[in-house]
Amino acid sequence: MEAFGGFVMDEQAIQVENVFLEFLKSFRLDANKPELYYEAEIEAIRGGESTMMYIDFSHVMGFNDALQKAIADEYLRFEPYLRNACKRFVIEMNPSFISDDTPNKDINVSFYNLPFTKRLRELTTAEIGKLVSVTGVVTRTSEVRPELLYGTFKCLDCGSVIKNVEQQFKYTQPTICVSPTCLNRARWALLRQESKFADWQRVRMQETSKEIPAGSLPRSLDVILRHEIVEQARAGDTVIFTGTVVVIPDISALAAPGERAECRRDSSQQKSSTAGHEGVQGLKALGVRDLSYRLAFIANSVQIADGSRNTDMRNRQNDSNEDDQQQFTAEELDEIQQMRNTPDYFNKLVGSMAPTVFGHQDIKRAVLLMLLGGVHKTTHEGINLRGDINVCIVGDPSCAKSQFLKYTAGIVPRSVYTSGKSSSAAGLTATVAKEPETGEFCIEAGALMLADNGICCIDEFDKMDIKDQVAIHEAMEQQTISITKAGIQATLNARTSILAAANPVGGRYDKSKPLKYNVNLPPAILSRFDLVYVMIDDPDEVTDYHIAHHIVRVHQKHEAALSPEFTTVQLKRYIAYAKTLKPKLSPEARKLLVESYVALRRGDTTPGTRVAYRMTVRQLEALIRLSEAIARSHLEILVKPSHVLLAVRLLKTSVISVESGDIDLSEYQDANGDNMDDTDDIENPVDGEEDQQNGAAEPASATADNGAAAQKLVISEEEYDRITQALVIRLRQHEETVNKDSSELPGIRQKELIRWFIDQQNEKKKYSSQEQVKLDIKKLRAIIESLVCKEGHLIVLANEQEEAAEAEETKKKSSQRDERILAVAPNYVIE
């Protein structure tokens, strides 16, 4: 249809142009109102200095069925005429829009809201040239470059100028010079200042995980964006592209090693029987005779697939988490207020989270607050303060950790689910790849970039390699990803919340050890989580019955077995509305936050307390974020003290302590013999008068104690740790003193160590009777035996009674143990 820059007349296309112009000049949403619907588009184009007119395709379908069928079936053919109709409409309605300075200014047409949205696998050669919508996930975006639309060429032989040569998806020169005396066909110079260029961007789109058939790999497709819709699709967005399918040469296939078949005619072998069918290698005559083609998609509109398909297309650039409450209708706002006014609505919101999982209310509450998030802030220096909440779930196998992650990834519009074992550092953050067509390096988004302004769920977090864990340090706190490689230096945004699940070391959580010994994660990463929850699979008859009953009901009745107070749609809408609020701290809440943080720090330094990790300023910031999220859940614009108290309780239940069992030391008291008569060697700290009064009752007391020895010796884990720490510190102090003069062994006799501890407790007025002293001596002997035989924290340096007679050893077994010299194991580190 092109000849020397002109076009052959297409009667049907001209008819489509006229009917489309009539549609623009006469369409009204309300027949009773005089104003034209698309006349407002002209004002929007003028106000935003735009060149794009957005057309709702449902309006075209309601106006003229023949017109919508022609556009849908042969869009690529009629697209220049539709653009011309838009330009004529703008000039007729506003003649001053096209000024003398820009006589060639075009108005581009963009369709949206098509009745059907196809999957990527449904795009076949039958769709070439048709107007279709396709949905997928953006995985890669190129930089914006200028594209030559209409070229102006100068003949190098005669100097003639040929204008408006349309480019057919490749660099297209005139076929022959317009001068009748010039026969030039190949020697041309492009006049760039007189040619027409447009912004151009290539986007790689991939199938969503829900659309991939079983056993298949996800397919991808290149999408070409032009004019104003460039930079509207970001990596990680699930988008709806509207446009047409075209066929372009597959350059990467031609550039690969090996021969590629081309169909060409060789004049030197015209008489040969094989003429015209020889294989030719390389990129010669690209796009003309090569046989390797692939599909591409030229889009004219971009929509974010978040359920709001009828939103204003022009507000896409500002469509982040801004407080835009105008996106909710009056009915939706009424429904949100009804949910807010429901009695005990916060617990009902929590109960509606992950209804297939029984119990775990604290974790559901943490996930809800993570979805709501805190408020992002920026300091005067331009430093961003994180508002997203990170949550880590550590638990035994089969505790529904992955169910929480799957549910969270499904309820959030922008989310990524990945596994830590199969994820590398580049796969989580970003990688630098080479463009196959240009050879230039570009950045390809990883999981954290794809989840920007969303949530990244990482399963098997503890299985990641150390070098891969280090890569997400910056992303978890500063929420940026810095890349310096292959000549590219960039800082990318990763404003995402991280929900991680990890298994404890050895498969089961050991309550007798702190969290840092139970999970294979460094303290630097643990401190970046606002909430760390531990799920322990303890046998409990009542709980096990309810869990089994719930699971069987779900398998039997499916959705009918679940009866959450609020549906998933209502929950999504409530969370979306709550995120538009930006609550501020009240003076009372600010004061309570400071007091709570000081109390947490005080508890962190108290000897004998068990904490998951050190209380730092990060935990104070976590309290602020949690308080803001709780205020959002209540639809409050002010953080109250009650919100802070709930945040403190959540932090305490998550990181301060884990319900730990008592320690049974019965086997070690049996090993010691534990005859209370052996305490004679240890000085009695209680007054002598009490000793005389109790002297007559000594035989009976000994008999009673022998009976008590048969009982179990059980102490709490906190007491065990407190006594252990005191003994180790005393031994270390003595070791440092001995090392200075080196005149004696760097250890303390066991009975002297016990006597020192009893004296220390007596100075604090801990004892009121002789029985308490004897009980503590029994505990100390059992704990020391455990530290020597089981834990290995203490070692025996010498025992002066080793060479005593065997009978004497049997008679005074406990006394012999009291004579041994103890020291701290060299590899033991005090917590």
From Swiss-Prot:
Keyword annotations = ATP-binding, Cell cycle, DNA replication, DNA-binding, Helicase, Hydrolase, Metal-binding, Nucleotide-binding, Nucleus, Zinc, Zinc-finger
Question: Which Enzyme Commission number(s) are on file for it?
Answer: 3.6.4.12
Q: Which domain of life is it from?
A: Eukaryota
What GO cellular component is one of the record's annotations?
Answer: THO complex
Q: In which tissues is it expressed?
A: Expressed in shoot apex and flower buds.
Q: Where is this region: Disordered?
A: 258-278, 666-705
Comp. bias (Acidic residues): 675-692
State where ATP binds. G395, D396, P397, S398, C399, A400, K401, S402
Task: Report the residue ranges that make up the MCM domain in this protein.
Answer: 345-551
One term of GO molecular function:
DNA helicase activity
What CDD domains does its record include? MCM6
**Reaction equation(s) it catalyzes:** ATP + H2O = ADP + phosphate + H(+)
Q: Which SMART domains match?
A: MCM
Please, one GO biological process term? DNA replication initiation
Q: Which Pfam families match?
A: MCM, MCM6_C, MCM_lid, MCM_N, MCM_OB
UniProt feature, compositional bias: Basic and acidic residues = 259-268
First-tier enzyme category under EC: hydrolase
Location of the protein in the cell:
Nucleus
InterPro entries hit by this protein: MCM, MCM6, Mcm6_C, MCM_CS, MCM_dom, MCM_lid, MCM_N, MCM_OB
Span of zinc fingers (C4-type): 155-182
Per the record, the similarity remark reads:
Belongs to the MCM family.
Summarize the protein's role.
Probable component of the MCM2-7 complex (MCM complex) that may function as a DNA helicase and which is essential to undergo a single round of replication initiation and elongation per cell cycle in eukaryotic cells.
Question: Its quaternary structure?
Answer: Component of the minichromosome maintenance (MCM) complex, a heterotetramer composed of MCM2, MCM3, MCM4, MCM5, MCM6 and MCM7. Interacts with ETG1.
Q: Which protein is depicted?
A: DNA replication licensing factor MCM6
Supply the source organism for this entry. Answer: Arabidopsis thaliana (Mouse-ear cress)
